[in-house]
């Protein structure tokens, strides 16, 4: 298996963070990202870049982190006993975008690299990541385009790649206590190393580079759609699902908290405003009801199974 080039991965991730921030600033037209660099006592650090109160984006956070440690945390070794007793290095770019307009979906993307070392043994390494979309008032054309872009970037790596990682995304971003998906999915992959370093790195780069080209057209199409208090209230209510998932189920959040990561950066994904409502039920045949009946469940958006 080819030897991992951690410096090349880090260089790509830093460049990706810069390009995504520049692209989001262009889409917003008003807001700018403030950079906040930090160091981790146990080793490593990163830079959090946050845009708040923009014209289009209520809050957008794009975080780069590169942390090292003497021992893998419990969240990483729970199902992988071979990692116990190894030092680790983890780096990645993670982002969450919360738009102002309820007709614009929230989105999340992440690309990451882990390597665990032990004297006298080969390193254990893998790539992970993906991107997903969380609409409040979904438009089928947006969802289909989102999945078509995900499908197309996977094609050079094999016919089975998109269906596999699309299914994994549906399964991962699922809230069992609500019996619904967090959104309409996209791609999710982890433990990627079986094709060697170069090929695995190429795929991670394709996912990272494919995020903004998939999200930008949706932003341009929906950012000026008129909305009222009813739509805003529903958006804030649905944002609650984002909070529930991230604090209860998300492995990245748990990993960050268990490794002494920077809390502000880890919780950067939280929406700036959110509301809960007891026993909420959408009005029958409403746009809000359509989200529940037609979108918050796994679906073959590209009709590949026909």
Swiss-Prot record:
GO BP terms: protoporphyrinogen IX biosynthetic process
Positions annotated to bind a divalent metal cation: 98, 108, 147, 177
Positions annotated as active site in the UniProt record: 108
Pathway assignment: Porphyrin-containing compound metabolism; protoporphyrin-IX biosynthesis; protoporphyrinogen-IX from coproporphyrinogen-III (O2 route): step 1/1
InterPro entries tied to this protein: Coprogen_oxidase_aer, Coprogen_oxidase_aer_sf, Coprogen_oxidase_CS
Essential cofactor(s): a divalent metal cation
Positions bound to substrate: 94, 110-112, 260-262
Protein name per its UniProtKB record: Oxygen-dependent coproporphyrinogen-III oxidase
Source organism (scientific name): Shewanella sediminis (strain HAW-EB3)
């Amino acid at each position: 298996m080819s030897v991992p080039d951690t410096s090349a991965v880090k260089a790509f991730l830093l460049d990706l963070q810069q390009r995504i921030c520049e692209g989001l600033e262009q889409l917003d037209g008003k807001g700018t990202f403030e950079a906040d660099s930090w160091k981790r006592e146990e080793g490593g650090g990163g830079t959090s870049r946050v845009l708040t109160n923009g014209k289009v984006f209520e809050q957008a956070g794009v975080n780069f982190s590169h942390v090292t440690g003497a021992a893998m945390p419990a969240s990483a070794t729970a199902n992988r006993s071979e990692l116990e007793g190894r030092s680790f290095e983890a780096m990645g770019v993670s982002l969450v975008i919360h738009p102002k307009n309820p007709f614009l979906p929230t989105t999340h993307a992440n690309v990451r690299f882990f390597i665990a070392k032990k004297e006298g043994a080969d390193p254990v390494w893998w790539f992970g990541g993906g991107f997903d979309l969380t609409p409040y008032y979904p438009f089928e054309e947006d969802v289909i385009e989102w999945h078509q872009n995900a499908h197309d970037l996977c094609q050079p790596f094999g016919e089975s790649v998109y269906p596999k990682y699309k299914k994994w995304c549906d399964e991962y971003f699922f809230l069992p206590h609500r019996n619904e998906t967090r959104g309409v999915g996209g791609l999710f992959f982890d433990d990627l190393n079986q094709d060697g370093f170069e090929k695995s790195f190429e795929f991670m780069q394709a996912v990272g580079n494919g995020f903004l080209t998939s999200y930008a057209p949706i932003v341009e199409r929906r950012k000026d759609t008129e909305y009222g208090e009813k739509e805003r209230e529903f958006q804030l209510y649905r944002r609650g699902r984002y909070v529930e998932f991230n604090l209860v189920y998300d492995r990245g959040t748990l990993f960050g908290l268990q490794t002494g990561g920077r809390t502000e950066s880890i919780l950067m994904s939280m929406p700036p405003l959110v509301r809960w409502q007891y026993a909420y039920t959408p009005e029958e045949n409403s746009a809000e009801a359509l989200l529940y009946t037609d979108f918050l469940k796994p679906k073959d958006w590209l009709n590949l199974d026909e």
